[in-house]
From Swiss-Prot:
This is Dihydroorotate dehydrogenase (quinone). It is found in: Cell membrane. It is an enzyme of class 1 (oxidoreductase). The active site is at S179 (nucleophile). It comes from Mycolicibacterium gilvum (strain PYR-GCK) (Mycobacterium gilvum (strain PYR-GCK)). GO terms for biological process: 'de novo' pyrimidine nucleobase biosynthetic process; 'de novo' UMP biosynthetic process.
Length: 353
């Protein structure tokens, strides 16, 4: 049924329909009786799916990835739709408009999206106010990025300001140095640049801190970031962000859409490779959150057994619809029982053991 609805929705420009659908989801989950009704049907209630990760209790492993709810307007929404948590942002220390539109595109033959949003958001102070007056029945993480006008040498202070404002209001923080849509941002993934940023954020908050990395990094750079994360005592790594690669795309005209990061199935293979490499490198020293191209419960199960304690999706939600998260949760719960696991944690990394 959603397939027919999706065809109609896809007749509207991507950013516009995103706003309309998001507004509709918020409206549908604002009345408490409606939200409770949806939660009974869609939320992960099976205890086998629950886990405690970096001291936070997650009712299910699948979260909403950063980028969908940049300013925390739907904090009350995501648990009722089946997500075990949500990651807000990316938010920057200063409010900024992002890149000029059009800046979001569909690649339907690839079931993918291309975006060059450029961290459009209302700023960390505004998100802090929003979180202070909001409530959620699932953990809420916050993804923080660098303000575009901030010079690279001032990046540590910029990230630290967001951490200061948001740390106490979030279940965890993610330092985003991997978006391809802010000039020079990915250069901050070098250990020399990343160390002072992470150190500055850690100095501002006792909330668990993770770093989000790009799929386009060389393997040696992934190893270096993993080692740095362990050294500094980070809670974990989010792998991966969108890719700038255009290899293997099937959608006609995709090459003409211009700059931006691609999410969905085109990044899945590399996201899994990075996850496996990270797990082999750090084992249980860090929590690994896998994101990128997860569409089915089989995909989710593969990531969990490869070492992911938590998962995230955005593009899969766009193409899969409102029942997507529940289908992932139901499939993972079935696989846990089929394979004799009593808890989700027992399955994490089991394919590598």
């Amino acid at each position: 049924m959603y397939g027919a609805l999706r065809k109609a929705l896809f007749l509207v420009p991507p950013e516009r329909i995103h706003g309309l659908v998001f507004a509709g989801l918020r409206a549908a989950t604002t009345p408490v009786p409606l939200r409770r009704s949806l939660s009974r049907r869609l939320a992960p209630h099976d205890p086998v799916l629950a886990s405690t990760v970096f001291g936070v209790r997650f009712p299910g492993p699948l979260g909403l990835a950063a980028g969908f709810d940049k300013d925390g307007l739907g904090v009350h929404t995501w648990g009722a739709l089946g997500f075990g948590y949500a990651e807000l942002g990316t938010v920057t220390a200063q409010a900024q408009p992002g890149n000029p539109p059009p800046r979001m595109f569909r690649l339907p033959a690839d079931r993918a999206l291309l975006n060059r949003m450029g961290f459009n958001n209302h700023g960390s102070a505004a998100l802090a106010l929003q979180l202070a007056r909001s409530s959620s029945d699932v953990p809420i993480g916050v993804n923080i990025g660098k303000t575009k006008v901030t010079e690279p040498q001032d990046a540590p202070a910029d990230y630290a300001e967001s951490a200061r404002l948001l740390g106490s209001l979030a279940a965890y923080l993610v330092v985003n140095v991997s978006s391809p849509n802010t000039p020079g941002l990915r250069d901050l993934q070098s250990v020399e640049s990343l160390r002072p940023i992470l150190s500055a954020v850690l100095a501002e908050t006792s909330t668990p801190v993770l770093v989000k990395i790009a799929p386009d990094l060389a393997d040696t750079d992934i190893d270096d970031i993993a080692d740095l994360a362990v050294e500094l005592g980070l809670a974990g790594i989010v792998a991966t962000n969108t890719t700038i690669s255009r290899d293997g795309l099937k959608t006609p005209g995709a090459a003409d859409l211009g700059a931006g990061g691609i999410s969905g199935p085109p990044v899945a293979r590399r996201a899994l490779e990075v996850l496996r490499r990270l797990y082999a490198r750090v084992g249980d020293k860090l929590v690994l959150i896998s994101v990128g191209g997860i569409e089915t419960s089989d995909d989710a199960w593969e990531r969990i057994t490869a070492g992911a304690s938590l998962l995230q999706g955005y593009t899969g939600f766009v193409y899969g619809g409102g029942l997507w998260a529940r289908s992932i949760n139901d499939g993972v719960a079935a696989r846990l029982r089929e394979n004799g696991f009593g808890t989700l944690a027992e399955a994490v990394g089991s394919a590598a053991r």
